[in-house]
Amino acid sequence: MGPPHFVGLGAQKAGTSWWNALIHEHPLVHRAGGQPKELHFFDRAWEEPVEEADLRLYWQHFPRPEGGVAGEWTPGYLIDFWTPELIARAAPEARILVLLRDPVERLRSGITHQLATSRTPLTHRDIQGAFQRGLYAPQLRRVLAAFPAEQVLIGQYEACRADPAAELARTIEFLGLPPFEPSAGALEGAVNPTTSRKFEPSPALRRALLEGYAPDLEQLSEIIPGLDLSRWPSARELGLA
């Protein structure tokens, strides 16, 4: 029992369920019986101060045998401005994992999921909220203000899809774990497939999204020198890659 060895912070609809499942295939990565991938432990931390006793309650989610490691991945942590600092208090030595995705594609996937799971009509607030989640620069600045850069691994969903074996090996090495072979088919598997009709923004909305994301994409190159913007159709369309 103790602080988590790793915490995944985001981003939503960027392949985190798939990637978390791959990490948990490692024989040294332990998950308590019945524990979900997403704990959402800090979601309501804005309501009242988080005390040291609360942080110790968080630790109780991570029992593991001697020599094993444990962690969680709650994608919503990335956008909640209060969360990186709280995780740094709870687990100052944790390895932090972030997966990013082309922001327009991430928005399309997020709205598609919402339409498939919600009975309420889509509103402009839904689009605005989904747009905000794709503004990665301020979110990553908060993460890097709370943790040293060497404790943070920022990957791209598109790179994971293109070469999952190499990206998983990089992730496992970052976590300080020995190499392993995932089960057959796990590297290619989709954890959250959808059969619903995909949301397609209108040409006007797509142009507005591109214009809205352009300044953020330019900042990302400064924050993450190794980020390959050429993997993102949005960046290519904007002439940033």
What are these language model-derived features?
Residues 35-37, 141-222, 226-241:
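The conserved 3'-phosphoadenosine-5'-phosphosulfate
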Residues 51, 136, 213:
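Aromatic/hydrophobic pocket-lining residues that form the small-molecule binding cavity
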Residues 1-74, 78, 90, 94, ...:
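PAPS-dependent sulfotransferase catalytic core
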Residues 55-59, 84, 140-141, 217:
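Generic structural signal for well-ordered alpha-helices
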Residues 91-110, 133, 190-197, 201:
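N-terminal hydrophobic signal/anchor transmembrane helix of membrane proteins
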Residues 15-16, 58, 71, 87, ...:
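Generic structural signal for small/hydrophobic residues in well-ordered secondary structure
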Residues 80-98, 137-138:
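ATP-dependent NMP and nucleoside kinases share a basic, alpha-helical "lid"
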Residues 83-84, 108-112, 165-168:
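Short aromatic-enriched loop/helix-cap "lid" or pocket-rim segments at secondary-structure transitions
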